[in-house]
Amino acid sequence: MTTFRELGLSDSLLQSVESMGFEEATPIQAETIPHALQGKDIIGQAQTGTGKTAAFGLPLLDKVDTHKESVQGIVIAPTRELAIQVGEELYKIGKHKRVRILPIYGGQDINRQIRALKKHPHIIVGTPGRILDHINRKTLRLQNVETVVLDEADEMLNMGFIEDIEAILTDVPETHQTLLFSATMPDPIRRIAERFMTEPQHIKVKAKEVTMPNIQQFYLEVQEKKKFDVLTRLLDIQSPELAIVFGRTKRRVDELSEALNLRGYAAEGIHGDLTQAKRMSVLRKFKEGSIEVLVATDVAARGLDISGVTHVYNFDIPQDPESYVHRIGRTGRAGKKGIAMLFVTPRESGQLKNIERTTKRKMDRMDAPTLDEALEGQQRLIAEKLQSTIENENLAYYKRIAEEMLEENDSVTVVAAALKMMTKEPDTTPIALTSEPPVVARGGGSKKRGGNGGGYRDGNRNRSRDGRGGDGRNRDRNRDGRNRDGNRDRNREGSRDGNRGRRGEGQGRPGSSNGRGERKHHSRKPQA
């Protein structure tokens, strides 16, 4: 393994890294950082949980001249959650160097951001729409930018951000370094690389690292109407410390979180329709452990970096295999073990095969637990807790009463009574969830999403009346491209949570191939 001291980083960054408890670099960090420090353009293919933020963050921070009061680097991320997470990590890494980091994203008061921009941050981390909004307002100037990072570029493509990214890249100086990270490399991302990058160094994490060997993966064949009972029985049997349950739509997330609370589980949901304050509140409670189950849509959970997640439950099978990899990457981090469960309805077996092809891993089948098995699972958990108490606690104060009880009852009866009192009886409160259509793989291959509605039987099931939906645009926008509150960072993730009819790989926005503006870049290649 390569240590961070071998990578040629400055002393102030090494001090931060070591204070965070890191000594050895991950594979993506060890391969990326030396090339990036030399000023080379980088294409990095890596999933979340591989340490890619530090892979681009360390060389980005290393180049910053803190004596200059100007923006020297920008990181473009697909969602506000990821922008916040990346900003927090860069702040920690750049703390001893005193690098000023500013996250900017939609959903936050733009005037507050304008005031913060006047304090001369060195690095901006933001979503494409909000960055472009500040550029157009002339509240963000990029004339001194030396490094541009595109984080989760394929996800930004899926959310319809390619045109915004091209507009941002045409506004940075001709001579700059570009670091592009993407789990996959669809054609529009390749075209971005060809146009805006110079002889990029291509770094790819090996398949065995991408498929996350620390995660045990299981699938259960279960009918749609029985999924909720199966989920609660698994929660009773497995008793996860922290669990994330993935639903396909915002409606599903709302109904699931409410139903789990009715059954006695501490659960809350997160999706694109929540206010930023509410999202942060839910995430804080989840990190603190005051809620044990987080129910989320794919986009809302994108970029979350929460330690201690032991279980991921895919209540709804994802629309595409790549989303499955992102989902299960919430667990099994930092060398710890994790468990991922996938619910598969009878018509979704083809999508299961697609996922297994992508991950290069055959999942183990698990039978859906019965009510009796859930009860037995609860009893075994209580028995383990009792045994731990016997081995680790001082019980002298309780032994006199225990001896009196044993004079009148046999020991087995006493222990059985204790188990009964402590066991959480499986709740069978009737729950009615709105059924979601199955994701049916078509043509035996990886399903493309677009005009066919992303696998829904009736096409794009949440399209707006004017026929739009799936390109991530919000109907509330007026003619100048802004929504009612002037927030140009259109809530793409909100529409995507409930409406997955997004463009397939290989498709950007109409007319996006030419970008905006004709100004040449140092790395732009001649047109044939």
Curated annotation (Swiss-Prot):
Gene Ontology MF terms: ATP binding; ATP hydrolysis activity; RNA binding; RNA helicase activity; RNA strand annealing activity
Q: What is its EC number?
A: 3.6.4.13
Enzyme class comes to hydrolase
Q: Which residues bind ATP?
A: A46, Q47, T48, G49, T50, G51, K52, T53
Task: Give the residue ranges of motif Q motif.
Answer: 2-30
Its predominant location is cytoplasm
InterPro entries, from UniProt? DEAD/DEAH_box_helicase_dom, DEAD_box_RNA_helicases, DEAD_helicase_CshA, Helicase_ATP-bd, Helicase_C-like, P-loop_NTPase, RNA-helicase_DEAD-box_CS, RNA_helicase_DEAD_Q_motif
Q: Which GO terms describe its biological process?
A: response to cold; RNA catabolic process
Q: Which GO cellular component term is one of those annotated?
A: cytosol
Here the segments flagged for biased composition (Basic and acidic residues) are: 458-506
- Give the Helicase C-terminal domain ranges: 214-374
* Residue span of motif DEAD box: 151-154
Q: Which family does it belong to?
A: Belongs to the DEAD box helicase family. CshA subfamily.
Function of this protein? DEAD-box RNA helicase possibly involved in RNA degradation. Unwinds dsRNA in both 5'- and 3'-directions, has RNA-dependent ATPase activity.
Q: Which named protein is this?
A: DEAD-box ATP-dependent RNA helicase CshA
Q: Which organism is it from?
A: Bacillus cereus (strain ZK / E33L)
Q: What is the lineage of its organism?
A: Bacteria, Bacillati, Bacillota, Bacilli, Bacillales
Name the gene for this chain: cshA
